[in-house]
From Swiss-Prot:
This is Putative manganese efflux pump MntP. GO terms for molecular function: manganese ion transmembrane transporter activity. The gene is mntP. Probably functions as a manganese efflux pump. InterPro entries: Mntp/YtaF (IPR003810), Put_MntP (IPR022929). Belongs to the MntP (TC 9.B.29) family.
Length: 188
């Protein structure tokens, strides 16, 4: 399946919303906005968000022959579960991200916000998505959202965090539904 740039961009935006929400929290915890912190946050989150779908893609291509008959269902289920979880998290209590900025914390936060990208990478393998442009778009989009999230969190505060996760969840569910409907022949 050829996935267009718009579809890849929408998936990239959906995936970047967890990182965006955490970046907003980082910005909230800062007394004064630091562009260095925003840049490092964007690089960590964008880098991990690009790496994880690549790993998922490599795993998916390895096992593709075993599950080709149900790949569209797997894509639909994975994207929907990720999306539903993001929507659920958008309605829950706010997590406080401490104003700590060290390598260990950044790696943990980067992994936590990019686990769903691993599952998306697996679906990319089943859909034969050209992985280099896909991970590039995901990484750059997440970098930009994370960089801006630190600034937005520092300036505006908590009100955007839940909305970002809700929007990201809805986008991923819609993309999963689109993939399923295409494979079932309901969409051209």
């Amino acid at each position: 399946m050829i996935m267009g740039n718009l579809e890849l961009f929408l998936i990239a935006v959906g995936l970047s919303m967890d990182a965006f929400a955490v970046a907003i929290s980082k910005g909230l915890s800062m007394r004064r906005m630091s562009y260095k912190t925003a840049l490092i946050t964007g690089l960590f989150f964008g880098g991990f968000q690009a790496l994880m779908p690549l790993i998922g893609f490599l795993l998916g291509t390895r096992f593709e022959s075993y599950i080709t008959a149900i790949d569209h269902w797997i894509a639909f289920i994975l994207l929907s579960l990720i999306g539903l979880n993001m929507i659920k998290e958008s309605r829950g209590p706010c997590e406080i991200i401490e104003d700590r900025f060290n390598l260990k914390d950044m790696i943990i936060l980067s992994l936590a916000t990019s686990i769903d990208a691993l599952a998306v990478g697996i679906t990319f393998a089943f859909l034969h998505v050209d992985i280099v442009p896909a991970v590039s778009m995901i990484g750059v989009t997440t970098f930009l959202f994370s960089f801006l999230g630190v600034k937005i969190g520092n300036v505006f505060g908590e009100c955007y965090k839940a909305r970002a996760e809700l929007a990201g969840g809805v986008i991923l569910i819609l993309m999963g539904l689109k993939i399923l409907l295409e494979h079932l022949g309901f969409l051209g």
